[in-house]
């Protein structure tokens, strides 16, 4: 039997419904979730979208759990918090160690209680009404900001050497776009370690291997 502590912090809804991700990580605590919820408020306001800020999390190491366990955990979290949630009240999204599948479980559990409610989460599978390109959006957005900065300062991105810390959903797609735009990704790291190759890593092969469950140190040869 495992007892997990879960959180959903709603910071501000002056501009619209609360929205923010749901993360699964062993280091999750209330202070972190409160801080991230407030940041969601400011992010929504900064880009002038009609949402407020919230954040959720469960203190658990997902690597120690089966897919069946994670589904049960997600559904239990929804059952315990459903009265706080809703398409026009509080909308969840993928975050650290959660993904489109997590959002599908979340939506299904909420719909079991309140009726069909696809808008209670974003980042769900396209087949369930999710937005095409959602998986890539954050990583590509990071690169778009960098490109705008370089253009403003009249710097050429081509052949610039890039190091990326973190090779999850954000880092993978940031590396992909940077490589496509002509930058050279020479090093990446994840929670298990890092890898370096002076002439540049094969981002496409590295991303493929990581998607199949490898760490970056297992997926590509280079200087560790």
Regions found by a protein language model. Name each.
Residues 122, 130-224:
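Glycine-rich phosphate/diphosphate-binding loop of Rossmann-like nucleotide-binding domains
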Residues 1-132:
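N-terminal ligand-binding/catalytic initiation module
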